[in-house]
From Swiss-Prot:
Keywords (A to Z) from UniProt: Chloroplast, Plastid, Ribosome biogenesis, Transit peptide
Transit peptide range per the UniProt entry: 1-42
Phenotype of null mutants: Embryonic lethality when homozygous in non-permissive genetic background (cv. Wisconsin 22) or albino seedlings in permissive background (cv. B73).
GO-annotated biological processes: ribosome biogenesis
Protein name, UniProt field: Large ribosomal RNA subunit accumulation protein YCED homolog 1, chloroplastic
Subcellular location: Plastid, Chloroplast
GO cellular component terms attached to this protein's record: chloroplast
Lineage: Eukaryota, Viridiplantae, Streptophyta, Embryophyta, Tracheophyta
Organism listed in the record: Zea mays (Maize)
Protein's job: Plays a role in synthesis, processing and/or stability of 23S rRNA. Required for embryogenesis. May be involved in RPL23 transcript levels regulation in non-photosynthetic plastids.
Amino acid sequence: MYYPQPTVSLAAAVALLRPSLRRHSQRASSLLRSSTPPPWVSARRRTAVSDDFFTVELDATGVEPEPDSIDDGLPSPWEGAVVYRRDAAVQHLEYASTLERLGLGDLSSPDSRARAADLGLAGGTLDSTGAQPRTPVLVSVDVTRRRGRLRLDGIVRTVITLGCFRCAEPAPQGIFANFSLLLTEDPVEEEPDLGTIFQEDDDKGGASLACAMDGDQDIDWDDRLHFPAADKEIDISKHIRDMIHLEITLDAVCNPNCKGLCLTCGANLNTTSSCTCKPRNVQGLSPLKGVFK
């Protein structure tokens, strides 16, 4: 059976609720005007911190704000950093630093300093004994300018100390590593195709990436740095450290005639003659010699 629903207009509903809303608003206004606070406010005041609690008020006027930027007038980020300074009249540069100043002190040792002196790598001051207190790092750079870009072709010369993989003694290794950096005034954006040239591009007569880079396609994307025209210098110490890290090998030897360690007692055969261990005649396939018979 169908029962019709009564229809009430919005105006009628508001008229019915208006007396109730008026009573609640008057009660709230009276509570606010009364001198006696509500019970919940009194409870909140009782739980407040006591007056004898130790507090410190910070005076913001006595705090010096931190500088937003580093002073551009500094000669270099740190002492011994390799920093290229823009100069249109200079085409060749020489830098002298040390492994310690470049953050590679773990690769420096008295053996590396002695080998560097033998190779004629000298840089910095000498100590009281006439020896170098740090391992020198010499960097030579040739500058080529081309269409708002600077190409730095250089060589890093130093000596690092590695562990001999035969006897585990210090093994100084001379480093002569070439590097190339490309400094561009425009932001460096890596191509999405990573230099891939498709056959249809050649058929359409499009310019290849090699022609677009004008002979700089041999420089890796990680070696291309943004050097705005307004900047006067750029720090390339990170790339020098990376070049030295790439020269670390696992097959370094202290001497081509190194005898290594005894496989039985572990004695260094280069410095001891008391090892009496006899070499064992190991026949690798002797247990399997009769398998195919």
